[in-house]
Swiss-Prot record:
Belongs to the NXF family. It comes from the Eukaryota. It comes from Homo sapiens. This is Nuclear RNA export factor 3. Expressed at high level in testis and at low level in a small number of tissues. The gene is NXF3. GO terms for molecular function: RNA binding.
Amino acid sequence: MSLPSGHTTGHTDQVVQRRARCWDIYQRRFSSRSEPVNPGMHSSSHQQQDGDAAMHGAHMDSPVRYTPYTISPYNRKGSFRKQDQTHVNMEREQKPPERRMEGNMPDGTLGSWFKITVPFGIKYNEKWLLNLIQNECSVPFVPVEFHYENMHASFFVENASIAYALKNVSGKIWDEDNEKISIFVNPAGIPHFVHRELKSEKVEQIKLAMNQQCDVSQEALDIQRLPFYPDMVNRDTKMASNPRKCMAASLDVHEENIPTVMSAGEMDKWKGIEPGEKCADRSPVCTTFSDTSSNINSILELFPKLLCLDGQQSPRATLCGTEAHKRLPTCKGSFFGSEMLKNLVLQFLQQYYLIYDSGDRQGLLSAYHDEACFSLSIPFNPEDSAPSSFCKFFKDSRNIKILKDPYLRGELLKHTKLDIVDSLSALPKTQHDLSSFLVDMWYQTEWMLCFSVNGVFKEVEGQSQGSVLAFTRTFIATPGSSSSLCIVNDKLFVRDTSHQGTQSALFTLVPTAFSSSVPAFSQEQQKMLPS
């Protein structure tokens, strides 16, 4: 059944208008949630502003339709941010690892020094730790300023590739307790040691460049431009790439090489001050000190040949604020702990050295325990130019700082009282000055006394007769029979003495310091005294 042509046209117009209204509602509802993917389609959708139904119909009939799964504007912005971040990451990945290790210093310069930190590295020996790291590291490195700080071990390396290689070692090495050792790498400034370190060859190159660029007529030199002088750039001094190092080095060279050149602004500060004179309150090098004494000391330390200070003859510089006329504290003398111990020890020493100096030392057998030990030491090697008075002590010396042979150490340790007395009898005959004795009771219990004796003696026979030597003797003793002491350990250390006038003031066998607190000798003991 056919419809009239007019009816067909009207019906078609209604359908187009209905579709247009539906599209407007649909577009307003979802315009904020969807956008065409193609930018060209996106721009064409904004051209539907004239309300023409035919245009709306044409748009509806086009292949472009609403796609509910397209990316929203919010998410698309996020994707752009991710793309930007990905682009940055790709650029970063394109850099070699060594370049990524380089960090910016606080002053904005690109640093080539790195600080290597081993957490809790204080428990590791320096040599052991560095060898362990070097064995695992793919490149050799030279640690600079190895030190311990805050329980950690730290050192510096120069070169980003070395720092990157050390970073790769982290977690790949283990200590003796089978714990992983971590390594942290951070950019750092130039270590203090490097500022002071400069090879002689580079010093000569700096001197040459400074002499060529110095304006002698005006006594001027631009040190800031020194690293970029042709002589410095052409030679492999690495100064142009490290101006700080050049500045620090050139200042040191400047003082000794071109002393006439003064820093800018320093001329006015020194006006009116003649050579050899200074004023403490006008010194430009001491403005940081608040008190005058510190100011004066600092000037005298910098200028030790100064003749006149503040119009007066300059005093001598004092070290650490200590006045030159002050002396060290004097010795406090002997220490015994109690009066009873004092009498016991002094009486023992008098009896011991009375027999020791008598010429027949076999009487000392009763003073030693059956299993006692004895050792003798002197502070010289047989090859050293020691005084002749020590020659007889060399063969018995058991100085373990010098003697490394374990067999000889064991042989020279005298064991049992018979060996001890035989060794003592072989030593030169002596005469001890009891008035020079200083006794230190450094440990005591109910069953043991430990004390040291310091004093001097002289040899009374042989080629070294009359020579005076000093000694320190350490006794460990236990209570013996007849309220006396029994020696279980005896260590004798003999050394040279530089006391002036010692021989003339020594050798009263029964000094007043001892006789006042110790009973006098018996008649039998008096007979043993040499006439």
